[in-house]
Amino acid sequence: MSGKELRYGFTTGACAAAAVKAAAQMLRDQGMVHEVELMLPCGIGASFQVHGGVLRDNTASCYVVKDAGDDPDVTNGAEIHVTASIEFFTKNRIVIEGGTGIGRVTKPGLAVPVGEWAINPVPRSMILEVVKEVFALRCIPATLTFNISIPNGEELAKKTLNERLGIVGGLSILGTTGIVKPISAKAWTDTVDASVDVALACGARTVVLATGRSSEIVAQKHLALSEEAFVMMGDHFGYAMRSCASKEVPEVVVAGQFAKLVKIACGHEQTHVTSSQMDLDALAWWLREVPATAHLEQMAREANTARHLLEASGYNQAVIELVCSRVLKVCAEVAPWVKMRVMLAGYHGELLYFTP
């Protein structure tokens, strides 16, 4: 077994923000920039090499090459280009737009509204922050426009799920932490085991298995438990449940957002998008069987994503309780001796439901 530590990489969002910062500095200082420093959302500082700088009167262009580390990411090596332009004596505003190789959202249910460029909220926020940082002392009113492009983005997007999700014409600018963690199932499951061991060793009677960081944050806000009690299981639901059962954890809380809980409810023990598709047809059948939700069957069949269904139904309480009850049923099948609860985290940091 190799002892090599897997190398982290950077998200397209982090690379785009770095390229924007470099182009903004070039525009402000009227000089070339070869490297920029960036504080990532996860709190880690990072340095990015800047390439292809071109400077004209009111425009500046450059690009950053995405390094995905040891993660098998199709966008590894992609060039994230940015062209910055400034128009003086206009309304003070910052415009972020997509160009060649950046997709547009055509279906509901995603974090970005239909019709918008597929630049997700966290990368967009990062970009706004670096622009405000660079032009903090700007006195003359001006419109700053940043055009983000990926030359081969449309071709690369064919290797992703973008088209199925309704993102057409290219890639998405993604990321919530700024870093890409290498996918290593063995490393991840080893971490789950170790985390559960630590929780028990620290006296935890309840272990919270979170599908992601956003869900974990919601759980931490609402549960008065020690830090060690929170375990990031990621997509490894089945493994994490069996780990808790084998270690005789008294109580387990499964915390996740709606789309992940739908996957678990459908019986998928591994919930990564490449290994289990969200089975909205199954959900439609469940809705049909319950009088309070039968009228939503067709909506489920026509939904683009599970999140789309949740939002389109107006966060229907009966739908939420149905999915959470199905998750409890699956948990009982996987680990029948463990006391279980399910927490549904919203997409905006709120708690939507917590089973009794």
UniProtKB/Swiss-Prot annotation:
Gene3D superfamilies reported for this sequence: CbiD-like
Taxonomic superkingdom: Bacteria
Name of the protein: Cobalt-precorrin-5B C(1)-methyltransferase
UniProt catalytic activity: Co-precorrin-5B + S-adenosyl-L-methionine = Co-precorrin-6A + S-adenosyl-L-homocysteine
SUPFAM superfamilies hit by this protein: CbiD-like
Intrachain disulfide bonds: none
Molecular function in Gene Ontology: cobalt-precorrin-5B C1-methyltransferase activity
Family note: Belongs to the CbiD family.
Record has S-adenosyl-L-methionine as a keyword: yes
Keyword Transcription regulation carried by entry: no
Enzyme Commission number, as recorded: 2.1.1.195
Organism, scientific name: Citrifermentans bemidjiense (strain ATCC BAA-1014 / DSM 16622 / JCM 12645 / Bem) (Geobacter bemidjiensis)
Pfam families assigned: CbiD
Coiled coil: none
Pathway note: Cofactor biosynthesis; adenosylcobalamin biosynthesis; cob(II)yrinate a,c-diamide from sirohydrochlorin (anaerobic route): step 6/10
